[in-house]
A protein has these predicted regions:
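Surface-exposed, interaction-prone regions used to assemble/regulate multi-protein complexes
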Residues: 1-129
Length: 129
């Protein structure tokens, strides 16, 4: 399933699971009437995660990250060399930003190197992808 082919508005964020090199977001998709797992491998971090009461998604998009226009990546590059292999991950390979905006207009971003979407329960998750 391709992220960009899924209609995300009115979906509900159910769960966020974070591990080394992996973040998984379980989302109830209202259009498909099923739970989906957004698998973020080559996980680098999350910023601005502020969930208090609203978990309904207004918008969700994936963007390639450019160094110069992203504070998160600039800070990451200050801490880690771009060309060193960190357990199969190399920062110079690039990052994606998964930006999720909730109905209260607060958005958060997940930074990783690869994003896949599967039906939740049908996944065979490998954290070393």
């Amino acid at each position: 399933m391709k992220f960009e082919n899924i209609f995300w508005p009115d979906s509900q964020l159910v769960k966020i699971q974070i591990e080394y090199n992996y973040a998984g977001l379980v989302i109830w998709n209202d259009v498909l009437k099923k739970h989906l797992l957004v698998k973020c491998s080559g996980f680098a971090g999350i910023n601005n995660l502020c969930i208090w009461d609203d978990t309904i998604i207004l918008n969700a998009n994936v963007y390639p990250v450019r160094d110069a226009d992203n504070d998160f990546v600039r800070n990451l590059y200050k801490a880690y060399d771009r060309d060193v292999d960190y357990g199969g991950r190399v920062l110079s390979s690039g990052l994606l930003e998964l930006r999720i905006e909730l109905v209260n207009y607060i958005s958060f971003s997940v930074y990783c190197q690869k994003i896949d979407v599967v039906e939740y329960g049908d996944e065979k998750r490998q954290t070393n992808n």
